[in-house]
């Protein structure tokens, strides 16, 4: 008889055959005092990924389950369709998860601490008041070509943050998060229909609690030349991050001020680059391929050279006012609060040392 798992690890794959074994081994090697299930979803790979996953499923039939999406042979889906399929994969895994806690993992990344799941579950178990919906930690970039590593975020002491404080300042890669399985309480974090990419996955859970942060680097985020992330320019990544400000309103309007603070840097860079014809053209082309309502608004913001005088005047007025307000909020409201929280965490550490 299968035991009820405490943690469900949800892994998504597409044409990642060279990395499957390392990823699966890092998860199955976890040392815990509770049962763990590993759910794998593949987006119709044609490079042998599915066969490798089936072998792991046969080897660990009580732990590993594999789901495969249908895919038209040779199909080359556009960006929106690829994101939709990724949403479907992650949603399917979430609905299948039986654990009290869930962790997401990309199929080419891997855990580096065999106590990772135990450490995070211990934090959430101790939080009997359910103040935290997630426990996150630091990770390391891992360059496939050289084997070099580098922490994703600057070292930070262990601390607890409310949902708004987290969304204003902190970034934790989704692979480093352990979430409470809110689906067991009948809550569907995917019901909003928002595209679930990177940070937006974490944001789906934030309305249900804060985040406890551990400073340990416990996973490697593989950097592969030619990947989707590396094919995008820095400017295009600014645009995608800025679009999250509007997407998050669909989930919870109460986080909009935090979102303004979070995306301040991206908007300041977009605003500063508007007078560069090359960057403006790049932005318009890139945004033209993003079929969302909010992409239209962002197109107006970055299009400084619009022939419409009123549109240019609106850009000149709207952006500086918005920039000033968010900078004031960041400096006088959020930064002091976070400093106080970090100082409180430091004092507690000194008292327990």
How does the language model describe each region?
Residues 102:
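Short aromatic/hydrophobic "clamp" motif used to bind/position activated sugar donors
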Residues 70-97:
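Glycine-rich, basic loop-to-helix element that forms the pyrophosphate-binding segment
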Residues 95, 137-138, 155-236:
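Conserved nucleotide-sugar donor-binding catalytic segment
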Residues 33, 272-353:
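Membrane-interface aromatic/basic loop that binds lipid-linked glycans or pyrophosphate carriers
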Residues 16-29:
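Short, well-formed alpha-helical segments that are part of the catalytic scaffolds
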Residues 165, 221-225, 230-257, 279-293:
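Catalytic core of nucleotide-sugar-dependent glycosyltransferases
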Residues 110, 115-150:
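Conserved donor NDP-sugar-binding/catalytic core segment of glycosyltransferases
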Residues 42-51, 71-74, 106:
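A conserved acidic beta->alpha catalytic loop
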